[in-house]
């Protein structure tokens, strides 16, 4: 197994590992070679975007989002294009998903949940006021920065999964219905602002309760519960919080509470401070126009550099501060990705992962020392895909990265726990990693 890895550059950015995948895009960790700063780069396939007939809407929304500098919204720094790809350079957020906190510590205290909800409503309201709707608010789009502040990702990019029909309303097919408004599930066309608000209500419920308001193993029963807003508050929910949630989770979008009304709600207003930030637009949109006009003179340079040795310290650096800790440390915080080290030969690691995944209902696809685990039977929360990669960091030491490629965050955590029980004999305690290499 090689100890080298070919580096790929796009413009001034050096691309690293894949940190997220979707139907239309892949997200990679990258480094600005001029400043050394970490960024995330969302890579879109131009042909798919053109086929989807959403170019104008995506162009408009990306242009708007590039101008937005709200503290609770993930920034778009730059847009680049090549002959076949669109590269969107984004702020890199290091604190994991908001719902990791729920998985690790259970429901939040009311004042803590309120603070995150205030930040969420601020972000949503700001983007709505500029004509951009999210339409796909769910746990993996709610991130935390290193200071514990909420950052909403993928605003302005959700048009990739939408279709506008002759009635002028948005239509979508949803794979994860738990956070989705009744009018979206009915596919009769919907108002993006009111649909976003419903999702915010579901998110607030989870923060306060520690579980979803609408949950059922039968998909049709789940749809019925959502359509009728059939849910029960846990006994510890305060009356003011119940009152607000009941107004948000109103199945009729015409009578559902609006954001201006939420901003005046007594429960919401407690301890509320509107964020202060610089709204001056010193940003150019020339790069966006060049990409979507497909101007060849503005195509970014894509190139692969000579392979160089990859050691554990470079891997730690590439991970931008993410913990290299043992996968099975019971105190370790859950993330959408994790790593462990092993002294086993790579072929044995692959075999053990296969043996662990198949009884859990996963189909395993192998390519060299990369594995893709895909749930054979999609659950009510859609398909769960898990990507793993084995990297050699010393002659007898390997690092294994396990990450969620697609699917529900909470489902990934369940998979992770089951996998950990089977792979314990493969994992080597990483506390000695530095001694091994020194």
From Swiss-Prot:
Q: What is its EC number?
A: 2.7.11.1
Q: Per the record's keyword annotation, is ATP-binding included, yes or no?
A: yes
Residues covered by the Protein kinase domain: 13-268
Q: Which InterPro entries match?
A: KA1/Ssp2_C (IPR028375), Kinase-like_dom_sf (IPR011009), NAF/FISL_domain (IPR018451), NAF_dom (IPR004041), Prot_kinase_dom (IPR000719), Protein_kinase_ATP_BS (IPR017441), Ser/Thr_kinase_AS (IPR008271)
Main EC class the enzyme belongs to = transferase
Q: Which cofactors does it use? A: Mn(2+)
Give me the ranges of the annotated region Activation loop: 154-183
Give the record's keywords alphabetically.
Answer: ATP-binding, Kinase, Manganese, Nucleotide-binding, Serine/threonine-protein kinase, Transferase
Q: Which reaction does it catalyse?
A: L-seryl-[protein] + ATP = O-phospho-L-seryl-[protein] + ADP + H(+); L-threonyl-[protein] + ATP = O-phospho-L-threonyl-[protein] + ADP + H(+)
Location of the active site: 136 (proton acceptor)
Gene3D superfamilies (UniProt xref)? Kinase associated domain 1, KA1, Phosphorylase Kinase, domain 1, Transferase(Phosphotransferase) domain 1
Q: Where is this region: PPI?
A: 335-364
Task: List the transmembrane segments.
Answer: none
- In this chain the NAF domain maps to 305-329
BP terms from Gene Ontology: signal transduction
Name the protein family.
Belongs to the protein kinase superfamily. CAMK Ser/Thr protein kinase family. SNF1 subfamily.
The text the record gives for the protein's domains is: The activation loop within the kinase domain is the target of phosphorylation/activation by upstream protein kinases. The PPI motif mediates the interaction with the ABI (abscisic acid-insensitive) phosphatases.
- PANTHER family in the record, alphabetically? CALCIUM/CALMODULIN-DEPENDENT PROTEIN KINASE KINASE-RELATED, CBL-INTERACTING SERINE_THREONINE-PROTEIN KINASE 3
UniProt function note: CIPK serine-threonine protein kinases interact with CBL proteins. Binding of a CBL protein to the regulatory NAF domain of CIPK protein lead to the activation of the kinase in a calcium-dependent manner.
Q: What name goes with this protein?
A: CBL-interacting protein kinase 32
**Organism lineage:** Eukaryota, Viridiplantae, Streptophyta, Embryophyta, Tracheophyta
């Amino acid at each position: 197994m090689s100890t080298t890895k070919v580096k790929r550059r796009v413009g001034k950015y050096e691309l690293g590992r894949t940190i997220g995948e979707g139907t239309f895009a892949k997200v990679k960790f990258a480094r600005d070679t001029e400043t050394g700063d970490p960024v995330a780069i969302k890579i879109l396939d131009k042909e798919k975007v053109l086929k989807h007939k959403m170019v104008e809407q995506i162009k408009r929304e990306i242009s708007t989002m590039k101008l937005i500098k709200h503290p609770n919204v993930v920034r778009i720094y730059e847009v680049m294009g090549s002959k076949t790809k669109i590269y969107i350079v984004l702020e890199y957020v290091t604190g994991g998903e908001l719902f990791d906190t729920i998985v690790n510590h259970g429901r939040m205290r009311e004042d803590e949940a309120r603070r995150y909800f205030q930040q969420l409503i601020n972000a949503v309201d700001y983007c709505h006021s500029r004509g951009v709707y999210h339409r796909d608010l769910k746990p993996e789009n709610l991130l935390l920065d290193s200071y514990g502040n909420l950052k909403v990702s993928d605003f302005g990019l959700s048009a990739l999964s939408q279709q506008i029909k002759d009635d002028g309303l948005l239509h979508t097919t949803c794979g994860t219905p738990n956070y989705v408004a009744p009018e979206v599930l009915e596919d009769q066309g919907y108002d993006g602002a009111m649909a976003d608000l419903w999702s915010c209500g579901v998110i607030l419920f989870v923060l306060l309760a520690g579980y979803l308001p609408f949950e059922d193993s039968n998909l049709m029963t789940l749809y019925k519960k959502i359509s009728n807003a059939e849910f029960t508050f846990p006994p510890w929910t305060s009356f003011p919080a119940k009152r607000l949630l009941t107004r948000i989770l109103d199945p009729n979008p015409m009578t559902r509470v609006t954001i201006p009304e939420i901003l005046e709600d007594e429960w919401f207003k407690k301890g509320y401070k509107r964020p202060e930030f610089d709204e001056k637009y010193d940003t150019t949109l020339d790069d966006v126009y060049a990409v979507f006009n497909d101007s060849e003179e503005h195509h970014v340079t894509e190139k692969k550099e000579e392979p160089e040795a990859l050691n554990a310290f470079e891997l730690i650096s590439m991970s931008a501060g993410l913990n290299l800790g043992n996968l099975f440390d019971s105190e370790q915080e859950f993330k959408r990705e994790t790593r462990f080290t092993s002294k086993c030969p790579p072929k044995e690691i692959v075999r053990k992962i296969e043996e662990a995944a198949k009884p859990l209902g996963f189909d395993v696809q192998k390519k060299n020392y990369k594995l893709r685990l895909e749930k054979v039977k999609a659950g009510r929360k859609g398909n769960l895909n898990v990507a793993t990669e084995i990297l050699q960091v010393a002659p007898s030491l390997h690092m294994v990265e396990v990450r969620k490629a697609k699917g529900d965050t909470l489902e990934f955590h369940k998979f992770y726990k089951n996998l950990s029980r089977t792979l314990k004999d493969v994992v080597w305690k990483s506390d000695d990693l530095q001694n091994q290499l020194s």
